[in-house]
Amino acid sequence: VTRVAIIGGHGKIALRLARILADRGDQVTSIIRNPEHAHDVAETGATPVVADVETLDTTGIATAISEHDAVVWAAGAGGGDQARTYAVDRDAAIRSMDAALRAGVDRYVMVSYFGAGPDHGVPEDNSFHAYAEAKAAADTYLKSTELDWTILGPSRLTDEPGTGAIAVGGDRTDGDEVSRDNVAAVAAVVLARPSTVHQVIEFNDGDTPIPDALAAS
């Protein structure tokens, strides 16, 4: 049995992923900030754990994720407040990576976005700038660690029903989008596939079944 800890467990992708993993027999712990979200998490088959990664230090996060085989970072400040974006999307994310190393949880899957990185190109006066900077810092740090990392880069997210098919790579264009269902399905396949370690997988909805698309990436 694979034991997976999802940080940001009440997010739309996280809830979908927890259900997929629990349905296939994995043990899932979903770490959430708000105790009122515990019921939603439990309905997926995951075990809710209330812990605020924004305020926990590295040791605190390590305690929350110890005894797991993999960590998925699916948390986010959700835009808006710039200081909180850096606190969650950069600083807490980096602490979670250090925590994974400390806890001996080698597998780490980061949900980022298509085009993330130091050359993200988002202007400073754009409301997305802080998020782009925070994700660039977190992803760059993750690549420097000894973790068995994979970074997922979905394009613009939708709530359309999942097709189970994606297109990996290519250049990002304005019309690109991908369903949250498909992102969760990609994360589930990645967790079960060691060949995706040390890969950055950028993708849209497409025509290739997810297992095949990831085999070719």
Residue ranges and their predicted role:
Residues 30-95, 99-102, 191-195:
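NAD(P)H-binding glycine-rich loop region in Rossmannoid oxidoreductase-like domains
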